[in-house]
Amino acid sequence: MRVREICGLVSLVAMAAIGLPVRARQAANAPLPNIPELMQKVEDHQKQVEKLRENYTFTAAQTTEDMDANGHVTKTETEEDDDFFVNGHLIERSVKKNGKPLAGHDEDKETERVTKLVEKAEKTPPGQPLEGQTISISRLLDIMDVRNPRRETYRGRPTIVFDFIGRRNAKTHGLAEDASKKLQGTVWIDEAGLQVAHLEVSFNDKFRVGGGLLATVDKGTNFRFDQAPVEEGLWLPTGGEATVDGRLLLVKSLRQHISERDYDFKVFRVETQQSRDAKVDSAAKP
């Protein structure tokens, strides 16, 4: 499971002043915005920059480590993807596994998968998931309690920071909403960019899928997610990390540490035929 897929459930919920420049210290004294209004602005701004994201492709390198009950690594797998956006949807094309480029049948199978996904993305309105479920910011804020809003500087930029925790008594529908009730964490919102700069989330209780028959996510499972500005008005993911502890189908224990690094951002142009072939013609960003 990709780090961004895990963070997708909660990514929209998503130092000190000593020694900071004068501008940052002044910002720290400014009145805090209303958090629901701020998050609505974040959501609206994201819709505005979706087309701009489609001008970029980048590389995502992921390492997955399986661990035993004592925390010792028993297996390590790596994967490298070429990622790009179509109609507001992220498309991930696998190009390497365990350091070896995909070839032959594996490459053909991946091309077929990505081509179908691109076609589906072209027909799916932005904001609607290609797979699984989604949850709006306004709905998420109905499920979460927001606490301790404050100002901090994150990576040299002023941010609005707040903690959140799911309300156990909230009425929910669907997997994403049900999971949100058992999450807690902290989100850093870049004030100028209106983007989630950093997100840290953990499960504060067991979360059972299908009553535990399909899967159980244990308390303490956690993940983080980072974004950074690529150009004026555009932010893209730079990486993330997750520690997952749980069980599949009642019998198989799942203990994994997953890390992802996103890099090599490039400008590209997708032609009609290229979209159908799931290939991109890219040029390095100056």
Explain the meaning of each model-derived region.
Residues 1-3:
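N-terminal secretory signal peptides that target proteins for export/translocation
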Residues 8-17:
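Bacterial N-terminal signal peptides
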Residues 19-21:
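Juxtamembrane cytosolic interface motif at the C-terminal end of transmembrane helices
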Residues 25-184, 191-197, 202-222, 226-239, ...:
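Structured extracytoplasmic
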